[in-house]
């Protein structure tokens, strides 16, 4: 995973300094140990003539195009800049389409396709993306900042708006570095957490911070933010199908889904519990891989709670390079670190 953060606001006492942006970016260093980059632009104005400061920070975990694809990245003429956390599975198809329309790519990464897609489609571009993502785009042509989150919200994205300024980040840790962000605990959020074991969007544990909902994008311009849905789940089916058709369709969809997620310039692995879900995914991945898949399972020293024997059976059947890890009672010593991350 990677991490993104940043801010947009009037270039006054509320501007983000390079030092503050670095602290916001370093707060999520665990999300991206491979690279850290920041960018600040101050030669922008809003519709009322106010000077704007745009700050972007990025922590990278390299998966595709290890040497290139550094962020924040810009389009050909530097009028659009972006930070992006996630992976776009259909980037190959998108790239070929965009190159056919004359776009020039500077990297081989999946994220650059978002930039050029946005140039052509604006906020409608998110409908074309197949993947998991949290995106921040500065559009200097329109003097606006756009946030977007993938369809089911696999990648997190938090934001706050105060004093005509937008602050955003992959985690609350980045926003907490900004002193005037309201971090007062929301009692309603505590009630929701105790009821559901999580805080439903758009709320968070803090009164002054919101989560961008899955399948939504937000546009921040002239000190105001508007949120819109770009995708929703359609539970209907076009026509009734037979059980054997449903079985084959599920097989095709699952195989295609796993295949898309195996695009990588680094070694891949599979978390294998021995249950139906992880066993199916590992089996499909093994069928798509030219070399044995690496699989991992987590066990416990108490037999009643340990299911790694099932994982070992599946691993042996599939011929994976399997490794078992055991959680010991001493693991409680790192509980604070686990909660923090």
Describe the predicted segments one by one.
Residues 1, 7-20, 40-48, 100, ...:
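ATP-dependent adenylate-handling active sites, centered on carboxylate activation for C-N bond formation
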Residues 3, 11-15, 19-30, 75-76, ...:
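N-terminal segments that mediate ammonia production and transfer
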Residues 28, 34-39, 56:
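Glycine/alanine-rich phosphate-binding loops at beta-alpha junctions
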Residues 30-31, 48, 55, 63-65, ...:
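A short catalytic or substrate-binding loop motif that flags glycine-/basic-rich loops and adjacent residues
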Residues 64, 69-72:
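An anion-binding catalytic pocket shared by soluble metabolic enzymes
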Residues 108-142:
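Catalytic core of PPM/PP2C metal-dependent serine/threonine phosphatase domains
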């Amino acid at each position: 995973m990677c991490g993104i953060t940043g801010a947009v606001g009037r270039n006054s006492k509320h501007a983000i300094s390079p030092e503050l942006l670095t602290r916001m970016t370093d707060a999520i260093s665990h999300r991206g140990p491979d690279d850290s980059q920041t960018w600040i632009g101050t030669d922008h104005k809003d519709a009322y003539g106010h000077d704007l400061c745009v700050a972007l920070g990025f922590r990278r975990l390299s998966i595709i195009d290890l040497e290139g694809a550094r962020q924040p990245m810009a389009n050909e003429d530097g009028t659009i800049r972006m930070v992006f956390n996630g992976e776009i599975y259909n980037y190959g198809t998108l790239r070929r389409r965009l190159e056919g329309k004359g776009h020039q790519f500077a990297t081989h990464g999946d994220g650059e396709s978002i930039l050029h897609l946005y140039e052509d489609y604006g906020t409608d571009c998110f409908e074309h993306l197949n993947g998991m993502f949290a995106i921040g785009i500065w559009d200097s042509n329109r003097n606006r900042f756009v946030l977007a989150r993938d369809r089911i919200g696999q990648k997190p994205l938090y934001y706050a708006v105060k004093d005509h300024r937008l602050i955003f980040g992959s985690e609350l840790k980045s926003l907490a570095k900004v002193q005037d962000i309201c971090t007062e605990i929301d009692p309603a959020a505590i009630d929701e957490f105790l009821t559901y074991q999580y805080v439903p969007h758009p709320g968070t544990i803090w009164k002054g911070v919101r989560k961008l909902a899955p399948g939504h994008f937000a546009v921040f311009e002239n000190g105001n933010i508007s949120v819109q849905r770009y995708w929703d789940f359609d539970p209907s089916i076009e026509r009734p199908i037979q059980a054997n058709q449903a079985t084959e369709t599920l097989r095709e969809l699952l195989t295609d889904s796993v295949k898309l997620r195996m695009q990588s310039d680094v070694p891949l692995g599979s978390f294998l519990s021995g249950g139906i879900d992880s066993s199916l995914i590992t089996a499909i991945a093994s069928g798509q891989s030219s070399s044995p898949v690496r699989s991992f399972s987590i066990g416990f020293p108490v037999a009643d709670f340990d299911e790694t024997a099932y994982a070992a059976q599946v691993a042996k059947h599939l011929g994976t390079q399997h490794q078992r890890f055991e959680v010991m009672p001493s693991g409680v010593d790192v509980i604070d670190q686990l909660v923090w991350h």
